[in-house]
């Protein structure tokens, strides 16, 4: 089944952009980035910015990100995928990253949430951004929670 990504959550103040791959089924139903309760994205990011993002509504989460100059988007505009595994994404359409220069002129750092999105790191690096590939926030990745948490925290130290 072909799945559509979400529009970017960025503005002229965005300095850090986190790129995922493509929303999963639960996120699409909720129309929310990282909408699956088993995904640790909001817990990880909340611990980094010092806010309990897990316990507030989605709109307030996005506002907290903007206050902290953090944006969200996905590498893929659309793609076919059965279920939620990134390894099953096929026939993907890549987002137009060229719009970032105008939409987020202060963007400096692009973080990739997991291996699949990280495959596109060279494109953003070639555009002049500092880049880093992070361990995925997926709940399926919990066995490495400690190293994942420290890796995410380290990426935000600038």
UniProtKB/Swiss-Prot annotation:
Active-site residues per Swiss-Prot or TrEMBL entry: 39
CDD domains tied to this protein: UDG-F6_HDG
Top EC class for this record: hydrolase
EC number of this enzyme: 3.2.2.-
Known outcome of mutating residue 74 to A/N: Retains significant activity on the G/I substrate
SMART domains xrefs: UDG, UreE_C
Phenotype upon changing residue 39 to D: Active only on the G/I substrate
GO molecular function (one): hypoxanthine DNA N-glycosylase activity
Record flagged with keyword Heme: no
Effect of residue 39 to Q: Retains significant activity on the G/I substrate, but negligible activity on the T/I substrate
Keyword terms, alphabetized: DNA damage, DNA repair, Hydrolase
Recorded consequence of changing residue 86 to A: Retains significant activity on the G/I substrate
Single GO biological process annotation from the record: DNA repair
Substitution effect: residue 113 to A: Retains significant activity on the G/I substrate
Protein's job: Excises hypoxanthine, a deamination product of adenine, from double-stranded DNA. Acts on double-stranded DNA containing G/I, T/I, A/I and C/I base pairs, but not on single-stranded inosine-containing DNA. Also has minor xanthine DNA glycosylase activity. Lacks any detectable uracil-DNA glycosylase activity.
Record-stated family: Belongs to the uracil-DNA glycosylase (UDG) superfamily. Type 6 (HDG) family.
Identification of the protein by name: Hypoxanthine DNA glycosylase
UniProt source species: Methanosarcina barkeri (strain Fusaro / DSM 804)
């Amino acid at each position: 089944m072909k799945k559509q990504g979400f529009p970017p959550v960025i503005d002229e103040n965005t300095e850090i952009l986190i790129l995922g791959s493509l929303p999963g089924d639960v996120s699409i139903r909720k129309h929310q980035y990282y909408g699956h309760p088993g995904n640790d994205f909001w817990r990880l990011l909340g611990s980094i910015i010092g806010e309990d993002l897990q316990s507030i509504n989605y709109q307030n989460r996005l506002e907290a990100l903007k206050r902290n100059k953090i944006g969200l988007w996905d590498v893929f505009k659309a793609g076919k995928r059965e279920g939620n595994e990134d390894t099953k994404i096929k026939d993907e359409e890549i987002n137009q990253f060229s719009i970032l220069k105008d939409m987020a002129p202060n963007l400096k750092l692009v973080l990739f949430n997991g291996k699949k999105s990280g495959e596109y790191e060279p494109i953003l690096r070639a555009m002049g951004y500092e880049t880093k590939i992070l361990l995925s926030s997926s709940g399926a990745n919990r066995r490495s929670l400690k190293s994942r948490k420290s890796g995410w925290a380290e990426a935000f130290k600038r």
